Amino acid sequence: MKLQLVAVGTKMPDWVQTGFIDYLRRFPKDMPFDLVEIPAGKRGKNADIKRILEKEGELMLAAVGKNNRIVTLDIPGTLWETPQLAQQLERWKQDGRDVSLLIGGPEGLAQACKAAAEQSWSLSPLTLPHPLVRVLVAESLYRAWSITTNHPYHRE
C-alpha cells in the first residue's frame, strides 16, 4: 500500500519541509509515502473564493490514483486515538488499495473532495495551520505504523 498526501500549497517554511521529510524517510519501502503539492489559487482582495476552492479541488482529485481510497483531513472528521489510527492503517493495508489523504488550503476543502472521500479524519477540534498538518499527519501515520510492527518508536 502506498500513502499519498495531496496538499494545497507549494511554498512551505523550512521547518515544515525538514519535519515532513524526516518522517517521510522513516517509512518502510513496502509503505512509501509521497507528497503531491497543489498550487494555491491567488487570494486577492476581490478573489472568487468559491471558484478558487473548486479549482483546487479539481486539481487535488486529478492527482489521486483511480482506485485510491480518499481520506480528507477535516475538523468534523473522525478523531482517532493513536491505537485506533494503527487499527485503521491495518484495515487500509488489508483493503489493498493505495490511500490518498487530502489537506485543503486556507478555506478548507472543496465540496467535490468531501463528496469523493470514503473517510474524513480530524486531527483535532482546533483549527490548525495547514503547513503544520503535513508534519502531524506524517508523524501520526509513522507512529501508527510503528505500533502495527512492534517498532520501538511508540511507547505506551
Curated annotation (Swiss-Prot):
<comment type="subunit">
    <text>Homodimer.</text>
</comment>
<dbReference type="InterPro" id="IPR029028">
    <property type="entry name" value="Alpha/beta_knot_MTases"/>
</dbReference>
<feature type="binding site">
    <location>
        <begin position="123"/>
        <end position="128"/>
    </location>
    <ligand>
        <name>S-adenosyl-L-methionine</name>
    </ligand>
</feature>
<dbReference type="GO" id="GO:0005737">
    <property type="term" value="C:cytoplasm"/>
</dbReference>
<feature type="binding site">
    <location>
        <position position="73"/>
    </location>
    <ligand>
        <name>S-adenosyl-L-methionine</name>
    </ligand>
</feature>
<dbReference type="InterPro" id="IPR003742">
    <property type="entry name" value="RlmH-like"/>
</dbReference>
<keyword id="KW-0489">Methyltransferase</keyword>
<comment type="function">
    <text>Specifically methylates the pseudouridine at position 1915 (m3Psi1915) in 23S rRNA.</text>
</comment>
<protein>
    <recommendedName>
        <fullName>Ribosomal RNA large subunit methyltransferase H</fullName>
        <ecNumber>2.1.1.177</ecNumber>
    </recommendedName>
</protein>
<keyword id="KW-0963">Cytoplasm</keyword>
<keyword id="KW-0698">rRNA processing</keyword>
<feature type="binding site">
    <location>
        <position position="104"/>
    </location>
    <ligand>
        <name>S-adenosyl-L-methionine</name>
    </ligand>
</feature>
<keyword id="KW-0949">S-adenosyl-L-methionine</keyword>
<comment type="similarity">
    <text>Belongs to the RNA methyltransferase RlmH family.</text>
</comment>
<keyword id="KW-0808">Transferase</keyword>
<dbReference type="Pfam" id="PF02590">
    <property type="entry name" value="SPOUT_MTase"/>
</dbReference>
<dbReference type="InterPro" id="IPR029026">
    <property type="entry name" value="tRNA_m1G_MTases_N"/>
</dbReference>
<dbReference type="GO" id="GO:0070038">
    <property type="term" value="F:rRNA (pseudouridine-N3-)-methyltransferase activity"/>
</dbReference>
